Amino acid sequence: MPLFQLDEHDVTFPAPHLALKEPSGLLAIGGDISPARLKEAYQTGIFPWYTPHETPLWWSPDPRAVLPAGTLHIGRTLRKFLRQAPYTITLNQAFSDVIEACSVRDEGTWIGPDIKTGYRALHQQGEAHSVEVWEGDELIGGLYGVNVGAVFCGESMFSRRNNASKCAFVAFYNHFLRYGGQLFDCQVLNSHTAALGAIEIARDRYLEALSRWKKVIIDKKCWYQQSLEL
C-alpha cells in the first residue's frame, strides 16, 4: 500500500483500511491541523501523531485500543485511593492548560505548537474537551480528547501526583456513560489504559462501532463546565 499525500486544500482522507501494515496504521502524510481536518479525521477513525515541527502523519492502527461501556476495571488499590482522593475533578475548565501540561514530558512529546493550536480551536468549537484534576488551586493531572457522538477519543493525559490521571479517566468515563456514551477510544494500548480495562479490537470492528455510535447525539449538558464525581 502507498503512503498517501494529503492535499493542503482538501480535508478528506483515504479509507482507513488502506493504511500501511508497517508501521502499523500509518495512512497519510501532510495536510494541516485545522479544526475542519481534525473533525474529518475523527469522524473517519483517524488521528494525527508525529514529531513536533515535522510534517503531520495520520494513523488508523489495527488493532485499536478501546474501553467499551461497562468494562472499566478498578483494582483494589486504586478503588481504595479513589475513596480517599483529596482531589477535585472538573470538566472543560482549563483546556489550554491541560494540553500544555500534556506536552511537557521528560521522554519527549508529539504535542507541538500546531497540535496545540488545532485542538484549542477545536475546543472553542465544542468538539474537544478536557478533564482537570486539582489539589487546591493547583492543576495536578488531566486528560483531553475529542467527542464523536457516543464515542470519546482520548488523546493524552498527564499526572503530577499519585493516580491523578487515573482519577481524571475514571471520573470522566463514568460521567460520559451517564449521558449515553458507549465507547472510549484509547487508540493504542499501553500499560496505563490496559490496567483500566482497555482491550484491543480489529480496526474493522472499531470502524463499525464508530459508524454506529457517531450518529448518537449526546445531551449538550454533558459538556458544560462542571465538577465530576469519582
Swiss-Prot record:
Its main location: cytoplasm. It is found in: Cytoplasm. One of its GO terms (cellular component) is cytoplasm. Its EC number is 2.3.2.6. Keywords: Acyltransferase, Cytoplasm, Transferase. It catalyses: N-terminal L-lysyl-[protein] + L-leucyl-tRNA(Leu) = N-terminal L-leucyl-L-lysyl-[protein] + tRNA(Leu) + H(+); N-terminal L-arginyl-[protein] + L-leucyl-tRNA(Leu) = N-terminal L-leucyl-L-arginyl-[protein] + tRNA(Leu) + H(+); L-phenylalanyl-tRNA(Phe) + an N-terminal L-alpha-aminoacyl-[protein] = an N-terminal L-phenylalanyl-L-alpha-aminoacyl-[protein] + tRNA(Phe). Functions in the N-end rule pathway of protein degradation where it conjugates Leu, Phe and, less efficiently, Met from aminoacyl-tRNAs to the N-termini of proteins containing an N-terminal arginine or lysine. This is Leucyl/phenylalanyl-tRNA--protein transferase. It comes from Proteus mirabilis (strain HI4320).
